[in-house]
């Protein structure tokens, strides 16, 4: 009987230890030092930070991992220029994903954390409804600018994008021509899906803050 009790206690302890282990954060990247550089590996792609502006940005989300997006200045020059300026100022560091809808988008870029804020500047909306050609379709992984909407649309709402942007989780091509797509993920789709799956309140805000540690310019690294 004593042996049985001891065995059950051991099994219980093992279960507790295993349960604790499962709560550890599993990130989607590894790092290694090469000289004075830190090389980030995400699957088969290698990235390193860039001191200059590039068309690749790394979005580091605390406890979730890294997403890397390619920007398209040839298709949305005004939007990309504005985004790059904000990245250069570390504007996005410490901001949260304030709007998360599984099967649709994850949204960030608001210093107020509730969808009401932005930067000091608004930009011209680069999309067809505003008279500007932009053939970036809102498919999975696309980055696009959030803006105020109205019915009917006004010049003020069409040109109200500032700093808030969203990443499309599942194809939403009905947004084409109405919102300014400006980039697309090249790495980190598992992070996108992980964020999209969190529990939210009735306003689509995650119950626990999902914080951006930083957004930085990177470039591909070749060994």
Task: State what each model feature region is.
Residues 2-23:
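Sec-dependent N-terminal signal peptides of Gram-positive bacterial secreted proteins and lipoproteins
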Residues 20-223:
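Cyclophilin-like peptidyl-prolyl cis-trans isomerases
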């Amino acid at each position: 009987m004593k042996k049985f009790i001891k065995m059950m206690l051991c099994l219980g302890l093992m279960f507790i230890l295993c349960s604790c282990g499962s709560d550890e954060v599993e990130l989607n990247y590894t790092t290694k030092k090469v000289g004075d550089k830190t090389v980030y590996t995400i699957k088969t792609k290698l990235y390193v930070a860039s001191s200059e502006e590039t068309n690749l940005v790394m979005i580091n989300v605390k406890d979730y991992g890294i997403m890397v997006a390619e920007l398209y200045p040839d298709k949305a020059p005004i939007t990309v220029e504005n985004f790059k300026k904000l990245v250069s100022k570390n504007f996005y560091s410490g901001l949260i994903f304030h709007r998360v809808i599984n099967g649709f988008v994850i949204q960030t870029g608001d210093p107020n954390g509730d969808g009401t804020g932005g930067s000091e500047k608004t930009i011209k909306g680069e999309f067809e409804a505003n008279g500007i050609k932009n053939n970036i379709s809102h498919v999975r992984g696309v980055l696009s600018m959030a803006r105020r909407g109205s019915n009917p649309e006004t010049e003020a709402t069409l040109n109200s994008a500032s700093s808030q942007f969203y990443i499309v989780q599942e194809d939403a091509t009905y947004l084409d021509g109405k919102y300014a797509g400006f980039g697309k993920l090249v790495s980190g789709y598992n992070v996108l899906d992980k964020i999209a799956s969190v529990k939210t309140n009735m306003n689509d805000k995650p119950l626990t803050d999902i914080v951006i540690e930083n957004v930085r310019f990177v470039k591909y690294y070749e060994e």
